[in-house]
Design a protein with these regions (language model features):
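Hydrophobic core segments of alpha-helical transmembrane domains in multi-pass membrane transport
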Residues: 1, 32, 57-61, 111-115, ...
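Single transmembrane alpha-helix segments in multi-pass membrane proteins
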Residues: 17-66, 74, 78, 83-100, ...
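Hydrophobic alpha-helical transmembrane segments
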Residues: 19-22, 51, 55, 71-79, ...
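Short loop segments and helix-boundary regions at transmembrane helix junctions
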Residues: 41-42, 84-138, 172, 232-233, ...
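Transmembrane helix-bundle core of multi-pass membrane transporters
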Residues: 110-172, 272-281, 300, 307-315
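Helix-loop-helix "hairpin" substructures at the membrane interface of multi-pass membrane proteins
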Residues: 148-226, 249, 253-254
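Cytosolic-side transmembrane-helix boundaries in multi-pass membrane proteins
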Residues: 184-198, 269-315
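Transmembrane alpha-helical segments in multi-pass inner-membrane proteins
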Residues: 211, 222-286
Length: 315
């Protein structure tokens, strides 16, 4: 018969700790998945998100380690994201290579290069003093909710801020209308004078910059270090969250929080020595990902031209 330990996961302080940890852990998923939603809305599938995150995480960590400036590290991650976004755009938009294969190639490149740079330039695992929690006045004093939502570091708040910003961009601006038009019917958009390739370049690059920021949030706000394959597949989960959320930023945020709650829950179960096999606990978030992808009614909102290179004159 199951018996919870004295420090039960069902006690309020522990539950608050789990939910607060989930909010923190959602940060890299939000940066990466919201950015990927923007890229995919223009019709480009970027499976290289995880590789971009790895390079962004390393760049942020190394610059912060050598200069002592966290903000220079953040800028370095954004610059790396910019370069990787332009590379992905060149391959998939200009050269019209198959997007899925191109993205996997980009991931392998990011994985290999980040590992090589870490070995050559750092060598051993080192830590930095990362972003510290900031308690938001008044809101941080609210019982329970204040501890869960309003006592985090700047990258956490910034990640959640991307959700309304992305919604406003995609749904309330002329540029967002162009992005969605290019993603659903690039030929029609082209006939109306929209530069399809430019829109896709910008969208993919924005998404890649956000993936770089997701990597920086890992190395400078969550774990405060870098090691090989630090992301452990976060970028691929982020792509799955885009499908789960139906390309809607708010729904994507809900998926990121759901995944993070399950992930935080399994970590706390191990910390509190709940008698569940550790391998089974580690599997829980990924089993959840498979289930939500299988059950979520997301395909009705999929951009029609997703994963399809644009050729002028084709319909």
């Amino acid at each position: 018969m199951f018996q919870a330990p004295e420090t039960s996961i069902f006690r309020l302080p522990v539950a608050i700790g789990i939910l607060s940890a989930a909010v923190r852990m959602a940060t890299p998923y939000l940066f990466a998945s919201v950015g990927e939603a923007i890229a995919q809305s223009s019709g480009v599938l970027n499976l290289g998100v995880d590789g971009v995150m790895l390079l962004g995480a390393f760049a942020a960590f190394y610059v912060a380690l050598t200069t002592g400036s966290l903000w220079l590290g953040v800028l370095a991650s954004m610059f790396v994201g910019l370069l990787m976004g332009l590379l992905m755009s060149l391959i998939s938009v200009t050269l019209k290579a198959e997007q899925g294969i191109s993205g996997i190639g980009l991931y392998m490149f990011g994985l290999g290069l980040s590992s090589l740079l870490f070995k050559v330039m750092v060598g051993t695992v080192k830590t930095v003093v990362g972003f510290q929690p900031i308690k938001i006045p008044l809101l941080g004093n609210i019982p329970i909710l204040g501890e869960i939502f309003f006592q985090h570091s700047i990258p956490v708040y910034a990640a959640f801020l991307t959700v309304p910003l992305a919604w406003f961009l995609l749904d309330k601006t002329t540029w967002g209308l162009k992005i969605r038009a290019v993603g659903h019917n690039p030929a029609a958009a082209d006939s109306l004078g929209v530069n399809v390739n430019l829109v896709r370049y910008v969208s993919v690059t924005i998404g890649s910059i956000m993936a770089g920021l997701g990597g920086a949030s890992l190395s400078l706000a969550l774990v405060n270090l870098f090691q090989e394959n630090l992301t452990a597949g976060i970028g691929f989960i982020a792509v799955a969250l885009v499908y789960f959320g139906g390309w809607r930023p708010a729904a994507i945020m809900g998926g990121a929080l759901l995944f993070s709650v399950v992930n935080a829950f399994q970590l706390w179960m191990q910390v509190l020595n709940v008698r569940i096999p550790s391998d089974l606990a580690v599997m829980l978030p990924y089993v959840l990902t498979i289930l939500v992808l299988a059950l979520a009614p997301q395909l009705s909102r999929q951009p029609v031209a997703l994963n399809k290179p644009f050729e002028r004159g084709e319909h």
